[in-house]
């Protein structure tokens, strides 16, 4: 059976203070315990949707529901919401402002009124989890961009949320750093059953680390479904200003231009390798006949 929805929007419409329409009637469901990619070009509404999930962006109409309960935008309601739904911004400097790594990670916890031993346990566990324990006393402004990303993530994880929102988590990272942080996030989801929502325009990353996808354009949802359905909806992918994953595009060309008979949902190197090995085995079998 499909996982229950942990977050849901109904006809969500949000407008920025300058009058810019951010979200235009968005209906979307986020499955519990899965990784969902919000895919779209710049200005598609991905970041706005994350901000609405966290209560930062309040709708003009429609609503956001967490576990079937509409969000409460009172001070008390937002405080409770942000313990359950944590967000990591694209630019870590937007949420790092304490003098040291330890102090920055402790900031959110200090407002919860937790006993000091529990606060310390959470901070140390979060630092260990993201690999920044050795940086505990280091000034935040001395960190590399990748280290800042990890510290920002640790600050959110210390709150022990059930939903983790990530805005362009691989932006500004080298390929090795991007791969490492996405592998970490995937393992976090698998080991803890955490729900993760990733806003990105990196369509190569989505098939490797995500279960579901939401394709967005100009504040609207064009498609929502399993990640494997990207290729079936290639027209919507291109309408959104994106392209197919490189491997999927190659398969598309081989089938349409070169007469190959290949499965259409191949999107990763691993999947392509399996297909090619099968073709090779079939060729050998034909030669023996």
From Swiss-Prot:
Residues 7-243 form the ABC transporter domain. One of its GO terms (molecular function) is ATP binding. ATP binds at residues 40-47. It is an enzyme of class 7 (translocase). Keywords: ATP-binding, Cell inner membrane, Cell membrane, Membrane, Nucleotide-binding, Translocase, Transport. One of its GO terms (biological process) is cobalt ion transport. The keyword Amino-acid biosynthesis does not apply. It is a peripheral membrane protein. It comes from the Bacteria. InterPro entries: AAA+_ATPase, ABC_transporter-like_ATP-bd, ABC_transporter-like_CS, ABC_transpr_CbiO/EcfA_su, Co_trans_ATP-bd, ECF_ABC_transporter_ATP-bd, P-loop_NTPase. It is found in: Cell inner membrane. The keyword Membrane applies. Belongs to the ABC transporter superfamily. Probably part of an ABC transporter complex. Responsible for energy coupling to the transport system. This is Putative ABC transporter ATP-binding protein CT0391. It comes from Chlorobaculum tepidum (strain ATCC 49652 / DSM 12025 / NBRC 103806 / TLS) (Chlorobium tepidum).
